[in-house]
């Protein structure tokens, strides 16, 4: 039996966290063959690769439905539970909603100490409670590799929710968390990371996107998504394509986790970054950035920040409030008229 005292959860999975996602290009090909569902109250479905589904219940209420689960992204079971829960809850915040209920999704090896599962679930429960939602049950299966996540339902006004499209020419792009989680988790698996840098990436992944969501609710948001497994480049590409615009990213303005440049320059890039790049290149990428910064743009994030397209006039006040909330946010780019490419990296 694998005991709690000796566990290193990240050693049990070839890909950690959102880096284990099926690539966006492969996924798009599979989903393209599925039947389309037509319902006037289904306000957001699969058509735009958005963060969650939105279903109108009444003129004043819509349900946000999402689920997310993945392999361990932290060695400590409690940390893993918190990160997985924060990541799953994030999709509701990315739509401008409020999480209300959650259900556990668990895969767990039969030869592993059940106390490890208890700690994973405790971490998830504490994060759901922090979000002000309620944990109402779940489902478990046996599997060789532990996996954990949540199915989450949230509420939103059907007239006010955010979509990952609608970005307008002249909008500025604001990112609310530092990048580099995928690169850092690769370095952590190789035992190359200092304790300070390890704590920084864990704190970032455990941070709810609630505060960022509450700030953005006070302003006009033309488009919003959260940056997770498809990386900043992949999610920005989805926003650009769906909005029929080009997104320009200024890599000098990107908020970055400690020591990311060192490890990226060493080539510690997760495989998901290359799949994300291939996806973006299908609709066109123009880059003049340093290689490590370009890799950072496509680095798959776990429980990453919100990426919002907002009017330029609101940027100073938004940044002031995000800073007051203790968020490591940055104005990282802009939206321009559609060019021959959809993503430009400077």
Indicate residue ranges for each PLM-predicted region:
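Helix-biased detector of long, well-ordered alpha-helical tracts
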Residues: 2-346
